């Protein structure tokens, strides 16, 4: 038996009875990539308004007696609703669906059916899978490439069918019905039982599907195909938005356009050319800056070499600079008798360091320098360099190096 959400995708609330409520746990994504386990209950209802994940469509969100439902999954012919508050079996409850989320899923899913059918009808492009993402939807097509002309033709055709206000209907067929053979589909779940649910766009397509759909293509409003990307081997991914997502995308795009107009001091039609000019100017400045930095590194190396303080341990810190700057200095000095400790970056924060000198000394001291600076590094052939998080401890490194040199001199 189909759930109420499948029989009437436009229903927003209804009353039903709790069948069971059992302790359960739910693993969520939490913050970032860290998994979080929530303790709660799996609630089974006589019928449900909340769609359980399936057919490429995410599950619904909503409430049962104002208690938030955090996940809905299908288990055979029933739906499990995860809540963090128990509900009494046998009690009547009011179920409400998060309509904004539901209607968005209806628009995207019906949009996918329409694009899949039109791509096949016009160009024989078969759909092998699809994904209803949080920001965009992806249809995987069984073709190594899709031309811009094909994309434009598909988009024009699907939007014409939306303007034609074609009805969308749902019906159920028995497994032995000969018509099942004429229906588009990618197979049924292993635990499927009962009749086959078929979604039909009048005159366009009939497709096996368990998801929630609009009852008329006019509810899709519009479909925008953003383009295609290279997919898996010999596959192409077609990226699209339907309905309210197109409006939100236009709002974001218009906001970005206004911001760029203000920053670049030119109209939207000149944005690309203005950015190209900025990129070229930046590349030239970076090239000039690099040449100046190299000249400065050579001059700094000669200054250090001719300094009265030359010998033993020589240190230098500059706020501006990079790894190449330090290596040029080390190359110019080329001394294996002196320990050279160079750093660049924030004096009290993070930065880069380089230790150069006798191979044996550098191999011994390099890891210890990284440890003092609370950083990481690696080295070979008389050099050890890396990243540091505590440049404020440079004086401790200098003391460490001087102690080492003094000890070596005493032993000699």
Curated annotation (Swiss-Prot):
One of its GO terms (cellular component) is cytoplasm. The keyword Iron does not apply. It comes from the Eukaryota. One of its GO terms (biological process) is regulation of translational fidelity. One of its GO terms (molecular function) is ATP binding. It holds the Pfam family tRNA_SAD. It is found in: Cytoplasm. Keywords: Cytoplasm, Metal-binding, Phosphoprotein, Protein biosynthesis, Zinc. Its main location: cytoplasm. Signal peptide: none annotated. Binds 1 zinc ion per subunit. The keyword Transferase does not apply. Its cofactor is Zn(2+). The modification Phosphoserine is found at residue 174. Zn(2+) binds at residues 109, 113, 209, 213. PANTHER family: ALANYL-TRNA EDITING PROTEIN, ALANYL-TRNA EDITING PROTEIN AARSD1. Belongs to the class-II aminoacyl-tRNA synthetase family. Alax-L subfamily. Functions in trans to edit the amino acid moiety from incorrectly charged tRNA(Ala). This is Alanyl-tRNA editing protein Aarsd1. The gene is Aarsd1.
């Amino acid at each position: 038996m189909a759930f109420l959400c499948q029989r009437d995708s436009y229903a927003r609330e209804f009353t039903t009875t709790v069948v069971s409520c059992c302790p359960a746990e739910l693993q969520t994504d939490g913050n970032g990539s860290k998994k979080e386990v929530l303790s709660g209950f799996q609630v089974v209802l006589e019928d449900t308004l909340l769609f359980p994940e399936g057919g490429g469509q995410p599950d619904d969100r909503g409430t049962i007696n104002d208690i938030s439902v955090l996940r809905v999954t299908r288990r055979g012919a029933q739906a499990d609703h995860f809540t963090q508050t128990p509900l009494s079996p046998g009690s009547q409850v009011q179920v409400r669906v998060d309509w904004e989320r539901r209607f968005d899923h209806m628009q995207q899913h019906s949009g996918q059916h329409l694009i899949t059918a039109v791509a096949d009808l016009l160009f024989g492009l078969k759909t092998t899978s699809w994904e209803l993402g949080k920001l965009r939807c992806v249809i995987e097509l069984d073709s190594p490439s899709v031309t811009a002309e094909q994309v434009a033709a598909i988009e024009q055709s699907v939007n014409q069918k939306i303007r034609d206000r074609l009805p969308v209907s749902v019906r159920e067929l028995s497994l032995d019905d000969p018509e099942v053979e004429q229906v588009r589909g990618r197979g049924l779940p292993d635990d499927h039982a009962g009749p086959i649910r078929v979604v039909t766009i009048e005159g366009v397509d009939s497709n096996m599907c368990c998801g929630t759909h609009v009852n008329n293509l006019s509810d899709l409003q519009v479909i925008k195909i953003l383009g295609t990307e290279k997919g898996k081997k010999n596959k192409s991914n077609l990226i699209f938005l339907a309905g309210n997502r197109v409006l939100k995308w236009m709002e974001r795009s218009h906001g970005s356009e206004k911001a760029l107009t203000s920053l670049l001091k030119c109209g939207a039609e000149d944005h690309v050319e203005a950015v190209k000019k900025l990129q070229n100017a930046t590349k030239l400045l970076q090239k000039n800056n690099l040449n100046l930095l190299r000249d400065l590194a050579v001059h700094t190396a000669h200054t250090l070499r001719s300094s009265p303080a030359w010998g033993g341990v020589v240190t230098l810190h500059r706020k501006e600079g990079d790894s190449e700057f330090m290596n040029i200095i080390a190359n110019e000095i080329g001394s294996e008798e002196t320990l050279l400790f160079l750093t660049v970056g924030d004096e009290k924060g993070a930065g880069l360091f380089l230790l150069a000198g006798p191979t044996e000394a550098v191999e011994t001291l390099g890891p210890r320098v990284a440890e003092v600076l609370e950083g990481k590094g690696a080295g070979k052939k008389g050099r050890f360099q890396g990243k540091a998080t505590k440049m404020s401890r440079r004086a401790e490194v200098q003391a460490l190096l001087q102690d080492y040199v003094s000890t070596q001199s005493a032993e000699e």
